[in-house]
Regions:
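Short catalytic/signature loops enriched in Gly
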Residues: 15-22, 239-347
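ABC ATPase NBD coupling module
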Residues: 20-24, 79-95, 121, 128-129, ...
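Conserved ABC transporter NBD signature motif
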Residues: 70-78
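Conserved ABC ATPase "signature" region
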Residues: 77-78, 129-147, 256-257
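Conserved ABC ATPase signature
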Residues: 152-156, 160
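A short, proline-enriched helix->beta-strand linker immediately N-terminal to the Walker B motif
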Residues: 171-175
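P-loop NTP-binding/switch modules centered on Walker-like glycine-rich loops
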Residues: 176-178, 182-186, 190-268
């Protein structure tokens, strides 16, 4: 049995209107029917573009957001139905590392106070001295010195603050840690350090991770299984290597085509899938398949009317698409432009293709006149070159004559003036 299992989880936020008497006029369907399972000791990566509901789903697992419908089963217990007092005990075993390390740390508390607060709330450690000793041990595991306990969050770098956030989760000895964009706010060099730290802690402590991210390279490096979310739903799930080797959902294909390839020759040859339009509003999602408004392979049947279930297509690879097999076999053709056509338009690209084909078909090149044109050009150039100095000499002589006349006039005036 899985350590953490989600079954049809929905998180809908009501949209209210009115000054005195609030009335619900609609809902934001942030998470709309997500089912997944995470095995003990496994890392499950959840990816998708901004606004697809990844963070909301992670917070719903911890009951930081109320669950509208569905079940969150942790170690055999449905957390969605637990009273608040009973849920308190499970929160120690489920911890979260937040996206913004500075915003999640109290600026008025030093590090020892921040880490000891959770321990005291859950009764970990007999007294302050024992808790202090455990905090020193945890800080050493995340690569921070013991003198960090007396310092405040603003005195640390971004990477160090994220390590403090990880330490805060570890002091409670959790079974599952939900990492919400753990490295998105950090430099690339620091990202590698934090990812390696998470892997080392998983090996030494037997932790289970649910990693939420939009960086596909980070998710591939750390995850065993990857789920792809789009507009509140899971559209594809597969083992990490299988997903990157052969994505099957049109949305996943578009995501993977956006990942740059270091080899320039491969980068130039591979297909680039550009999607039309923006992510639809979760307050008014499309009917049928959520992705059909942007899908390059959209069909007139089913796509706009029936929402596809997430089905296993073999080897643990699950896809939510009506035409997965047909797209893979090539029997369903693209109905929307995807490459440069999506930017310049299909008519422009078609016209350029016709011109190229006509050029390659081989109209005879015009015969050039033999050497007469260059000879004429040389003669013209020589004539112009000779004319320029002659014209310059004439202008110089005119200016000299004018200057001589002015001097003569001035002399006559001087000689003809009154004598002393």
């Amino acid at each position: 049995m899985s350590l953490l299992e989600l079954d049809g989880v929905k998180v809908h936020f009501p949209v209210k209107k009115g000054l005195l008497f609030d009335r619900t006029v609609g809902h934001v369907y942030a998470v709309d029917g997500v089912s997944l399972s995470v095995e003990a000791g496994q890392t499950y990566g959840l990816v998708g573009e901004s606004g697809c509901g990844k963070t909301t789903l992670g917070r719903a697992v911890l009951r930081l957001n109320d669950i509208t419908e569905g079940a969150v089963v942790f170690d055999g217990t449905d957390l969605a139905k637990l009273p608040s007092e009973e849920m308190r005990a499970f929160r120690r075993r489920l911890q979260m590392v937040f996206q913004d390390p500075l915003g999640s740390l109290n600026p008025r508390q030093n590090i020892e106070s921040i880490l000891a607060e959770g321990m005291a709330a859950h009764g970990i450690g007999k007294d302050a001295a024992e808790r202090r000793k455990k905090i020193e041990s945890i800080l050493a595991k995340v690569g921070l010195p013991s003198n960090a306990m007396s310092r405040y969050p603003h005195e640390f770098s971004g990477g160090q603050r994220q390590r403090i956030g990880i330490a805060r989760a570890l002091v409670l000895e959790p079974d599952v840690i939900i990492c919400d964009e753990p490295v998105s706010a950090l430099d690339v060099s620091v990202q590698a350090q934090v990812i390696n730290l998470l892997e080392e802690l998983q090996e030494s402590l037997g932790l289970t991770y649910l990693v939420i991210a939009h960086d596909l390279a980070v998710v591939r490096h750390i995850s065993d299984v990857i789920g792809v979310m789009y507009l509140g739903g899971l559209v594809e799930e597969a083992p990490s290597d299988a997903l990157y080797a052969g994505p099957r959902h049109p949305y996943t294909k578009a995501l993977m085509s956006a990942v740059p390839v270091p080899d320039p020759e491969v980068e130039d040859r591979r297909e680039r899938i550009l999607l039309h339009g923006d992510l639809p509003s979760p307050a008014n999602p499309p009917t049928g398949c959520r992705f059909h408004t942007r899908c390059p392979w959209v069909q007139e049947t089913k796509c706009a009317t029936e929402r596809p279930p997430l089905l296993d297509t073999g080897d643990g690879h699950k896809v939510a698409c009506h035409f997965t097999a047909e797209i893979e076999a090539g029997t369903v053709k693209q109905t929307l432009a995807t490459g440069i056509e999506a930017v310049t338009g299909t008519e422009t690209v078609a016209a350029e293709a016709v011109e190229t084909a006509e050029g390659e078909a081989g109209t005879e090149a015009p015969v050039k006149e033999p050497a007469t044109v260059p000879a004429q050009a040389d003669a013209d150039a020589t004539e112009k070159a000779a004319a320029v100095p002659a014209q310059a000499d004439a202008e110089a002589k005119e200016k000299a004559a004018a200057a001589t006349e002015k001097v003569a006039d001035a002399t006559e005036r001087t000689e003809g003036g009154p004598k002393a």
